[in-house]
Amino acid sequence: MPKDASAPRRTRKTTGKKKKDPNAPKRALSAYMFFANDNRDAIRADNPGIAFGQVGKALGEKWKTLTDAEKVPYEEKATADKKRYEDEKAAYKANAAEFDEEE
């Protein structure tokens, strides 16, 4: 039996995406992201006209072939960036707490 077409439909309210605070610190990059940022242009130069998705795939394959010793500089950068993020996040939360107390 078909439903009555004139019956009101229930609609679900969408809450939407929460706006990101522009003053919030940027997230820390992983070792792979540092590697990808350093090597993306070289992959594009070696393969002119390569599609965006294929660049990521090539970077992933190249990352997998690296030895642990070759990954060390990227892991050190990631560790330093993680510390930077944690420090900035702590300062941001402290400032947010002070701002909330003032209101």
From Swiss-Prot:
Q: What is this protein called?
A: Non-histone chromosomal protein 6
- Show the GO MF annotations: DNA binding
What's in the keyword line of the UniProt record? Chromosome, DNA damage, DNA repair, DNA-binding, Nucleus, Transcription, Transcription regulation
Record's subunit section: Weakly associates with the stable SPT16-POB3 heterodimer to form the FACT complex.
Q: Which GO terms describe its cellular component?
A: chromosome; nucleus
Q: Where is the composition biased (Basic residues)?
A: 9-20
A Gene Ontology BP annotation from the UniProt entry:
DNA repair
The DNA-binding region ranges are 25-93
